[in-house]
Curated annotation (Swiss-Prot):
It is found in: Lysosome; Melanosome. Monomer. Interacts with CLN5. Interacts with CLN3. The keyword Metal-binding applies. The gene is TPP1. This is Tripeptidyl-peptidase 1. Its EC number is 3.4.14.9. Its cofactor is Ca(2+). Glycans are attached at residues 210, 222, 286, 313, 443. The lineage of its organism: Eukaryota, Metazoa, Chordata, Craniata, Vertebrata. Keywords: Autocatalytic cleavage, Calcium, Disulfide bond, Glycoprotein, Hydrolase, Lysosome, Metal-binding, Protease, Serine protease, Signal, Zymogen. One of its GO terms (cellular component) is lysosome. Pfam families: Peptidase_S8 (PF00082), Pro-kuma_activ (PF09286). Residues 1-19 form the signal peptide.
Length: 563
């Protein structure tokens, strides 16, 4: 014990001197709106911290993703197994040994890794963690839509410089739970209902996107789909059953989730969770559905990071995953964003389709040195996910053509360069759009998003046994598009073809084939004199508001069923 204390003391002296480094110097450490500090945490309280170990062969992984995702490649659709990915990226023995010894000397307990061995999660007391991570100071905070409690440090932390080649970042310190892409709008007023609908339901979705009663899962394949839940959001099985009773009468469907991965709470259902499950399972009807429930088993855990760890630890996963959460790019450290992006590369190499909501703040807005700029969202801005924007009906009470939903997130990343698969489409947009914002507001050479869109306005949801109208946001459009891709995977599997995997290279090569082009409307942005609240506007072809457009199922199936 005396030796361990001595080692910790030496480490603390080292960290306080020049032999330390900060893994995340650019991580935002301000308290997010809606959160309040409850004070310091007791020094003997236990924390669960996740150490992201430096991976190997990331460049090679990137090339493999390109090979298995490009229809023009001879390796298209020849996905890697989890074991293949682990063999490629697992940290060097030196990295694993160095970090383990460092943690053991600090008194870390119950450490466990994942199949790919690139994350290590350990338990430490607050006192041990603050000695280990010099500068960290843990407080308990309460906030979020469900008033959850988390333990975080708003102060920068440092590690011994000897660990710089071995540790990307430490999870469980700074990042608060991600925000949801969900709004509830007041119900529009309408007189008379003949020939009208009073909100988006599965039958409206199926009518608009040309899904027939026969467009459901066959029940004979190993096809599956999943959505992820955070922020202590839970769905209730009884709500799903009631939703299908009310709205699922004209198509075959499953009225229960096949598997819940993680903890499913017993509290009140969340509208977000209910929406995701109900519309993933009604768009991707009669297809086995998993729910990843990652509230964070402990106050110090990061739910989104826990979900990524689950993906790195299971060999057999659903083919399509939809996630309706995100953060502002500028609120996250470069180390964290780049590492999470690599996790998405790992998923793409395995043939998983990851869909993320584009957000509900239009182009976003923030002020840098008193100058306004648009504010992109992550993971929506990752070049290895398919990002889904939002639309509204031109006539809100009729199944008509779609226009931009003004809240639909979209824009250009300030972190990721523009991937080659979308360069031609972006150049075409920038050279032809008559309503471009000033160039100082966005990074025209960054990854542009969204890639596609779907209806995001005026949904009916059943939550806590109550039908709730006019729920809106790209949290709605994302599971709808995901369910439709699951139906296409069903046809591919029945034809002996691999699942779609990472969709973007094929999507951009086909230049919107199988999608309804949305050409009217603009989304919101900065409320200043220069742009007056207007961000980007949609137009013919791809645009950074609705991507290539919304699904026309028969045409999209025809475009994507080809080998």
């Amino acid at each position: 014990m005396r030796l361990r204390t001595c080692l910790l003391g030496l480490l603390a002296l080292c960290v306080a001197s020049k032999c330390s480094y900060s893994p995340e110097p650019d991580q935002q450490r301000t308290l997010p709106p809606g959160w309040v500090s409850l004070g310091r945490v007791d020094s003997e309280e236990e924390l669960s911290l996740t150490f992201a170990l430096r991976q190997q062969n990331v460049e090679r992984l990137s090339k493999l993703v390109q090979a298995v995702s490009d229809p023009g490649s001879p390796h298209y659709g020849k996905y890697l197994t989890l074991e293949d990915v682990a063999e490629l990226v697992r940290p060097s023995p030196l990295t694993f040994r160095t970090v383990q010894k460092w943690l053991s000397a600090a008194g870390a307990r119950n450490c466990h890794s994942v199949t790919t061995q690139d994350f290590l999660t350990c338990w430490l007391s607050v006192r041990q963690a603050e000695l280990l991570l010099s500068g960290a100071e843990f407080h308990r905070y309460v906030g979020g839509p469900t008033e959850i409690h988390v333990i975080r440090s708003l102060r920068p932390y440092q590690l011994p410089k000897a660990l710089a080649p071995h540790v990307d970042f430490v999870g469980g310190l700074h990042r608060f739970p991600p925000t949801s892409s969900l709004r509830q709008r007041p119900e529009p007023q309408v007189s008379g209902t003949v020939g009208l609908h009073l909100g988006v339901t599965p039958s409206v979705i199926r009518q608009r996107y040309n899904l027939t009663a026969q467009d459901v899962g066959s029940g004979t394949t190993n096809n599956s789909q999943a959505c992820a839940q955070f922020l202590e959001q839970y769905f209730h099985a009884s709500d799903l059953a009631e939703f299908m009773r009310l709205f699922g009468g004209n198509f075959a469907h499953q009225a229960s989730v096949a598997r819940v991965v993680g903890q499913q709470g017993r509290g009140r259902a969340g509208i977000e969770a209910s929406l995701d499950v109900e519309y993933l399972m009604s768009a991707g009807a009669n297809i086995s559905t998993w729910v990843y429930s990652s509230p964070g088993r402990h106050e110090s855990q990061e739910p989104f990071l826990q979900w990524l760890l689950l993906l790195s630890n299971e060999s057999a996963l659903p083919h399509v995953h939809t996630v309706s959460y995100g953060d502002d790019e500028d609120s996250l450290s470069s180390a964290y964003i780049q590492r999470v992006n690599t996790e998405f590369m790992k998923a793409a190499a395995r043939g998983l389709t990851l869909l993320f909501a584009s957000g509900d703040s239009g182009a976003g807005c923030w002020s840098v040195s008193r100058r306004h700029q648009f504010r992109p969202s992550f993971p929506a801005s990752s070049p290895y996910v398919t990002t889904v924007g939002g639309t509204s009906f031109q006539n809100p009470f009729r199944v008509t053509t779609e226009i931009v939903d003004y809240i639909s997130g979209g824009g250009f990343s300030n972190v990721f360069p523009q991937p080659s698969y979308q360069e031609e489409a972006v150049v075409q947009f920038l050279s032809s759009s008559p309503h471009l914002p000033p160039s100082s507001y966005f990074n025209a050479s960054g990854r542009a998003y969204p890639d596609v869109a779907a209806l995001s306005d005026g949904y009916w949801v059943v939550s806590n046994s109550v039908p709730i109208p006019w729920v809106s946001g790209t949290s709605a459009s994302t599971p709808v598009f995901g369910g439709i891709l699951s139906l296409i995977n069903e046809h591919r599997l029945l034809s002996g073809l691999p699942p779609l995997g990472f969709l973007n290279p094929r999507l951009y090569q086909q230049r919107g084939a199988g999608l309804f082009d949305v050409t009217r409307g603009c989304h919101e942005s900065c409320l200043n004199e220069e742009v007056q609240g207007q961000g980007f506007c949609s137009g013919p072809g791809w645009d950074p508001v609705t991507g290539w457009g919304t699904p026309n199922f028969p045409a999209l199936l025809k475009a994507l069923i080809k080998p």
